[in-house]
Amino acid sequence: MKHNGFEYVDLGLPSGTKWATCNIGAISETDNGLYFPFGGTVGLDSPHYEGNFDSHKLKFNGDIKATLHLDNDAAHIHMGGKWHMPTKEQFEELLDEKNTVSTWIYDYCIREVSGRLFRSRINNETLF
């Protein structure tokens, strides 16, 4: 299934939240994609931010919002449509053991990629 050209998985979560199958800037579920500071919209190849955060277009200075405005939302800027960065509540729903079973995988699909695999207790769909 796709929205605005990007694939997603429906884990059957109570909220109806659909999760993208890969990270922003990634071409597959096993690709790291880009890294963003909170509220940043310019992706970086490394998770390490050296120097001045201004150079990374970090827009917050002490006024951290629980939900980003769309002009500060990397997912919305890069993927468009209704895509947005997950909220705290969406992460909590994903992590809730009533909804999913999660396992840390060290060599996913024999691609030397580690990460967490979520399997829905509702419809058995998976998200890596």
PLM regions and their residue ranges:
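Conserved positions within compact, well-structured domain cores
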Residues: 1-128
